[in-house]
């Protein structure tokens, strides 16, 4: 083949290849791929991620409280996303003894409408007497910005969140919850009494939030968590930094200083229960840094979405600092916040 004929042939192949690539059908999962902020039935915060990896679809979900968990199945067909979640139910006899464990599967279907998601959840009732069907919504979470250069971030004047005398500047997140919070000797203390085994039923103690709301900031505080106790510090009411008696345990995304169920500390830096510990937390551009007792355990890591118990799934909103009060006794002092100055 001479040079001119080869050039024409090569050009034709190139154009044909470009046209073929242009005309290739989009993946059916393309409209659903990414992360979604959900408002689940009851108005609570949820989160969904759908991704295609190695030729198959996968996903994970946060449903109100608890942890981000993998979905049991993900299927996309005819413009409809179908996912399933499985949870166990214990069947007990009259004496309260577990006699049977069953797995219940709920199905969630979704359609994309622009940057919105319209979803329907169908779940069996726990006693097996039929199904419950609920509709809810979501919206696409914008892409994460680059990790900020924290050396260039400017922080404003410090704001003392707790005056050491009373609960001025704070109120219960749930107005009808029992209040275990009090100012005692310059310390913000939560006396949440957990029922003893076989004793009284669980009492719902309230979470405590600041009256003021904030965007990005640096927050420093001291915390004292007794043995086997549990609390949390919610940043903007959306992201929980875990407070837990986890001394001596391997690192885990549910242990002291973790971003609950999302980011595992790089090293275990907690102290034994009953000792005062320091937390230095920076939240900028949806990236978080946590310094526990002088050791950086989360270093400017991206936050992919809300955590369990969030007030909202909308990460664009300013929000309060809120302290978890329903899981056990805990004490805080020297809570100081410095907002980012843009």
How should these model regions be labeled?
Residues 28-342:
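Carbohydrate-interacting regions of secretory-pathway proteins
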Residues 10-21:
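Bacterial N-terminal signal peptides
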């Amino acid at each position: 083949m001479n040079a001119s004929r080869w050039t024409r042939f090569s050009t034709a192949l190139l154009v044909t290849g470009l046209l073929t690539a242009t005309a290739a059908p989009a993946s059916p999962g393309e409209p659903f791929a990414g992360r979604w902020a959900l408002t689940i039935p009851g108005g609570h915060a949820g989160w969904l991620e759908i991704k295609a990896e190695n030729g198959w679809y996968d996903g994970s979900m946060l449903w109100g409280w608890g942890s981000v968990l993998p979905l049991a199945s993900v299927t996309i067909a005819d413009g409809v996303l179908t996912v399933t979640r499985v949870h166990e139910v214990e069947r007990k006899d009259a004496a309260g003894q577990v006699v049977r464990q069953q797995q219940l599967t709920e199905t969630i279907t979704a359609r994309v409408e622009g940057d919105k998601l319209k979803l329907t959840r169908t779940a069996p009732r726990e006693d097996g007497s039929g199904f419950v069907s609920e509709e809810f919504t979501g919206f696409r979470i914008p892409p994460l910005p680059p990790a900020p250069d924290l050396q260039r971030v400017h922080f404003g004047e410090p704001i003392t969140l707790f005056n050491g005398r009373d609960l001025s500047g704070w109120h219960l997140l749930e107005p009808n919850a029992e209040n275990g919070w009090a100012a005692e000797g310059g310390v913000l203390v939560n006396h949440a009494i957990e029922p003893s085994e076989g004793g009284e039923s669980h009492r719902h103690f309230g979470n405590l939030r600041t009256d003021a709301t904030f965007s990005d900031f640096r927050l420093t505080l001291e915390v004292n968590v007794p043995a086997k106790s549990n609390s949390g510090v919610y940043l903007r009411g959306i992201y929980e930094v875990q407070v837990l008696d986890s001394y001596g345990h391997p690192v885990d995304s549910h242990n002291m200083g973790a971003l609950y169920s999302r980011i595992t500390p790089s090293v275990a830096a907690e102290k034994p229960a009953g000792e005062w510990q320091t937390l230095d937390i920076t939240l900028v551009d949806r990236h978080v840094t946590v310094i526990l007792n002088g050791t950086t355990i989360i270093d400017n890591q991206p936050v992919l979405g809300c955590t369990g118990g969030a007030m909202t799934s909308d990460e664009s909103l300013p929000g309060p600092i809120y302290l978890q009060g329903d899981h056990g006794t805990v004490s805080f002092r020297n809570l100081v916040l410095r907002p980012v100055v843009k």
